[in-house]
Amino acid sequence: MQTPVNSFKAALREGPVQLGFWLALAHPDIAEICAGQGYDWLLIDGEHGPQTLPGIVAQLRAVEATPPCSAIVRVPGHDSVTIKQVLDLGAQTLMVPMVETAEQAKAIVTASRYPPAGERGLGGARASRWGGYPAYVAEANAQVCIIAQIETATAVDNIEAIAAVDGIDALFLGPADLAATEGLLGASSFDALFKLTGEALARIVATGKPAGILSRDERLVQQFLDGGARFIANGIDSFTFAKGAGDGLRRWRERIAAQGGV
């Protein structure tokens, strides 16, 4: 076998919980730094981050150079051309936002698989090492991993139907968008959101498909750990950098003020 084995996909089925981190700043150095910290996976955010295709390739290379960390690419939407392009870049695991129905899930899977299992177009791109992996087309389908994001009330209603689609490997809850669609934004609504995410998690786990979440709120992360989630992201590069820079500034401002402004 020449096509790299998707270690993240394999780890979803067995082994410890996979811990990840979000890359929103679109820089390969940040990807390399974070991969070197020991994360199991990093998500390259092509939905909200300022990503370009060459930039995604650079981040993929940075993660690949720092094993055993795996890269996930979140594509901007359901567009089949974008899915094909990102897979051709060498990504093996894709996260797809705003999946609300089984029909959408089936179309995403179809776009990610070579015929006869799907409709992904053939091209001599980086994923096949520009033709250097002659067996790539025959081997690629088994290594592709598709994660459907559950982010709306409609998606929650359809959890079981989405999970039942062959080729959907995992479901990932988006608590921020879910809170927005349910009118649960703000600290005063946290208890209701916590109840909603707990119920959604239990339903995902009951389907037998791995569940995941991103949250900077430790209560939600712990809820998913306790509830059987298989992969969790606990931070975002942009927020982590902003907090570190701000905390350092405030600490020294306070120290200087305590010394009379010296």
Curated annotation (Swiss-Prot):
An example Gene Ontology biological process: catabolic process
Site (Transition state stabilizer): 74
GO CC list: cytoplasm
UniProtKB keywords: Aromatic hydrocarbons catabolism, Lyase, Magnesium, Metal-binding, Plasmid
Site, Increases basicity of active site His: residue positions: 88
Keyword Magnesium appears in the UniProt entry: yes
EC number: 4.1.3.39
Protein family according to the UniProt entry: Belongs to the HpcH/HpaI aldolase family.
Pathways involved: Xenobiotic degradation; biphenyl degradation
Disulfide bridge partners, by residue number: none
UniProt-recorded name of the protein: 4-hydroxy-2-oxovalerate aldolase
Positions of Mg(2+) binding: 151, 177
SUPFAM superfamilies named among the record's database cross-references: Phosphoenolpyruvate/pyruvate domain
Job of this protein: Catalyzes the reversible retro-aldol cleavage of 4-hydroxy-2-oxovalerate to pyruvate and acetaldehyde.
Residues binding substrate, per UniProt: 149, 176-177
Example GO molecular function: aldehyde-lyase activity
Catalytic activity: (S)-4-hydroxy-2-oxopentanoate = acetaldehyde + pyruvate
Catalytic-site annotation from UniProt: 48
Domain of life: Bacteria
Organism of this sequence: Novosphingobium aromaticivorans
